[in-house]
Regions:
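Alpha-helical transmembrane segments of multi-pass small-molecule/ion transporters
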Residues: 20-340
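Generic alpha-helix initiation/capping and coil-helix boundary signal
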Residues: 1-3, 310
Length: 340
């Protein structure tokens, strides 16, 4: 009798253990499937952005777009679709005063890269000015914003916008003023031109305007938000198309070493910053995810133009800028796979 009871109990335990193993197996398999589906979704969305860039580049090569059409597309993005996207996404998010610290993070990143550029430029004033301009600043509005909007939604756009507000002081005049001072010992740092440039920047005006309205809890009328959403939805496509139309590689092949040095330091610092933001900062997950992506933004789009204004090597600056876009696409896609 006792032996029969023991055998029944043993069979029962065996069935229970088998059931547990089966449940664990199903749970583990389900988790892997969800992870694979998420990775596939990320790669598909990232691939769609890259496909639009390739489309723009192909259309320019085919003669559909001319090189000067880049400036027309740039005006549409910077003055219409990007400000509309900022307005639409800010209208869906709540801003806390503590979030303003993100502006300092964007500003600090620019200062760090300017400092590295100053050191790497050595004693040659032209080299110092070139490195300051072509290592600092982030191309966020034209490049990274579509990624953060597409993967992190309104909250991601707000975090990106606050980060870019601090970054704007660097890439829209700050780096140029410091580079001018480095090139000409008689030149002095001036805040006035930077502020004038910022005031004329439609995205920056949209950042500041929506930030103030959010902090004082004033909402835009529903029809205005609806129009902004309609226009803002085109921003990702227009920004990626613009990048494709404007993409070009030029410069002296003998200067590959200088390009490699600038980009290796730029992205080496970005890797360290991304890891620190994601694993160390005591912030909510979506903040850490967005910041981990933002630090891999390409070099500021205005850098080649500012380089030309200081009589620098425009071809080399354009090559550095274009290659940084390729690297950023790869790095941002990789980071998204790991953090989402």
């Amino acid at each position: 009798m006792f032996l029969e009871l023991r055998e029944c109990k043993a069979r029962s335990n065996s069935v229970l253990e088998g059931s547990k193993d089966h449940k664990y197996s199903l749970f583990h398999t389900g988790g892997l499937l969800r992870r694979a589906e998420k990775m596939e979704a990320i790669l598909m969305k990232a691939a769609s952005f890259i496909a639009v860039i390739i489309l723009g580049y192909g259309l320019r090569k085919a003669g559909f777009f001319k090189e000067e059409d880049f400036y027309v597309l740039s005006k549409i993005v910077l003055k219409i679709t990007l400000p509309a996207s900022i307005i639409a996404n800010f209208s869906q998010a709540e801003i806390q005063p503590a979030m303003l610290l993100l502006c300092l993070v964007g500003f600090a990143g620019g200062v760090l890269y300017m400092s590295l550029g100053w050191i790497l430029g050595g004693k040659d004033r032209d080299e110092k000015a070139f490195h300051i301009l072509n290592m600092s600043g982030y191309n966020i509005g034209n490049f990274t914003m579509p990624f953060t909007a597409g993967f992190f939604g309104p909250t991601g756009v707000v975090i990106t916008s606050l980060f870019d507000t601090g970054n704007a002081f660097i890439c829209l005049g700050g780096a140029y003023s410091v580079a001018s001072m480095a090139k000409d010992k008689n030149s002095r740092f001036s805040v006035g031109p930077i502020l004038k440039t910022l005031i004329k920047s439609a995205p920056f005006d949209a950042y500041i305007g929506m930030l103030i309205l959010s902090l004082i809890h004033v909402s835009l009328p529903a029809p205005a938000v609806s129009i902004a959403q309609l226009i803002g939805n085109a921003n990702a496509f227009m920004a990626m198309l613009m990048l494709g139309v404007g993409f070009k590689l030029s410069g002296d092949k003998r200067q590959i070493g200088k390009i490699g040095k600038i980009l290796s330091i730029r992205y080496g610092v970005a890797v360290v910053a991304s890891l620190m933001f994601y694993f160390v900062l005591p912030l909510p997950l979506e903040y850490r995810q967005t910041l981990a992506v933002l630090v891999f933004s390409p070099i500021a789009a205005a850098a080649p133009a500012f380089t030309g204004d200081l009589k620098g090597d425009i071809g080399l600056a354009s090559a550095v800028n274009s290659i940084s876009i390729i690297i950023s696409m790869i790095m941002i896609t990789t980071v998204l796979i790991f953090v989402l």
